[in-house]
Structures are given as C-alpha cells and as structure tokens.
Amino acid sequence: MKQVLITGGAGFIGSHSADALLAQGFAVRVLDNFSNGKHANLDAGAMTTGRLTLVEGDVRDAACTDAAMKGVDAVLHLAAQVSVPRSVADPVESSTHNIAGFLNVLDAVRRHKIPRMVYASSAAVYGVPEALPLTEANTAKPMSPYGLEKFINDQYAALYRELYGVSSVGMRYFNVYGPRQDPKSPYAGVISKFADGLEGATALRVFGDGSQTRDFIYVGDVARANALALQGDVTGVLNVGTGTSVTLLELIDAMKEAFGKPAVVRHEPPATGDIAHSATNPARLTLTLGWAPVTTFVEGLRALAQSLRAT
C-alpha cells in the first residue's frame, strides 16, 4: 500500500483529499498545525486502523517537515496561508507560510527522493484576466502578495524539476466550495459566507451589483483531481475548475433553492481590486488526467446545505 503525505490534511481541501485517497486504498499521513484545520475533519475510523496517521506540526519547521517525509511515496502539499486580505495586511508573515514553508516541503521531497509532489497553486496568479476563459498559457499578473507567492511556488517547482528532476504539478484551484469550509474563517469563500447568512437569516453582503462571475468547483471534484495528479506524471501547472461561471446573483438564487430559505441581499460599494469575471478552461486537466467534474452546481449546494444541517 502506498503512503501519501498531505500537508494541511486536516483542512478543507486537505481532508477531502485524504478521504479520496483512503477510498482508493492509500495510506495517508497528515501534517497539520491546526491553525485552520480541525481534528473533526479527519476520518476517525481510518485513524483507529492506522491507515491514517497524524503528525502535528508546521511546514515552516524544517526538521518537522523532514521527519514527516520519511517513508512516503508521494506528497500533496496544501498547507498555506490562504487569505488574500491577510497577505496584503502582513506580506512578510504570509511569505513565511507560502514561500519558506513551500520551499521546506519541496526541498525535503528532493532530499528524500520522493517520486511525486502535487501542490496547491492558485487562480490568483492570473490577476485580472486579459481574456476568458483562462488557460495555463495566460500570463501571470498577480495582484496580491498571496498570488505572487503562489506564482513563486510555481517557479521554484519548475526550477527543481530542471535542476533535480523533482516531478511536480501545481493545481491552480478556482473557487472551491463544499462541506467543511468554515464560514467564520477569514479564509472562507463567498459560498460558505452566503450559506452562513442563509442559515442565520442575516443579510447577504454583495459588493457591487452582483454581476461578477466566478467558476465554482465542488471540493469533492477537487479532491479527485488531486488524487489523479498524484498518480499521474503531468508536470507544470493545471487549472482546476468546471469551465462554467455564474454571477453572484445567480449563485444566490441557486442557494435559496438548495437551502430552501429566503435571502435578503445587501448591496455595498464594489471592493477595491475585486476581479469582475473569472472562468477557466480545464482542457489540460481533462486531457492529461482524464478528469471531469461529476458534481453539478445544484448537487454541490445541496450537499453543503445537508452538511450544515447535520452539524
């Protein structure tokens, strides 16, 4: 049985990726500092049997990261500081997670001669799109320290492939949503915040007129993409999205139906630096890994609503 190390494996995308890998017969080791992840996100049954093991630590700690690498066959690196506003407020602190932490992981993969690394890049590297839909060939023009950090990750990964032969691919996630995304977290996406508003009967804040578009992708489909990438040999970067975008007002209508609740929308002035439209073409992901999204937008929203009512 092959073993995969997931950094940030108790978090939102990480825990779903752990579930996907466990379902495919892999053993999983999770490295997490629980600054954002939760013990409740981890499969208790798999921990009891030993198929899922936990190392509590931080990727910024080189010795801890090195120790967690021992005996693993692949690494899924998801640990990060993922708040764009936080990166703007404190770029130096953000870089310790997203550049220094990334480099600790990447270099440990090199030293331990681990055959495969998949890591979280981001659609934030593109900045304001020159044209839509976005492909991997689009020029990177990050608008935040977070986006720049992710682009630097991509450059380091490319250099390590060239210099040391480290096989890696960066997953440029678009707008991921689904169960276990904490709406109270500063990292929460718009869907989890709207879900919290619907459940709490509070107004949904929309910055601008609501015509902004986003490519929303269900976390289970992201987890499948991660699992496929770990087992593949494609390198470089891959856009991870559905190829379909919806406006925020369309999103609210769909959520009202999925949650079975009315919504009060409060329009506020447009947010500074907000990107009006975003969508990707996931053709390279489909071509190289045979991936396609299987969860419709309505199904994903219903799964989110059901998970919130179960907690």
Whereabouts are the PLM-identified features?
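Short amphipathic alpha-helical interface segments enriched in basic and hydrophobic/aromatic residues
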Residues: 39, 77-80, 195, 199, ...
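Hydrophobic alpha-helix immediately C-terminal to the catalytic Tyr-X-X-X-Lys motif of short-chain
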Residues: 152, 156, 160, 190, ...
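C-terminal substrate-binding subdomain of Rossmann-fold SDR/epimerase-dehydratase oxidoreductases
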Residues: 198-311
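N-terminal Rossmann-like NAD(P)+-binding domain of SDR-like oxidoreductases, especially those catalyzing
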Residues: 1-174, 295
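Residues in well-ordered alpha-helical elements
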Residues: 63-66, 73, 85, 92, ...
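A conserved pocket-lining segment of Rossmann-fold NAD(P)-dependent short-chain dehydrogenase/reductase
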Residues: 87, 137, 166, 172-182, ...
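Active-site loop immediately N-terminal to the catalytic Tyr-X3-Lys motif
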Residues: 91, 183-184
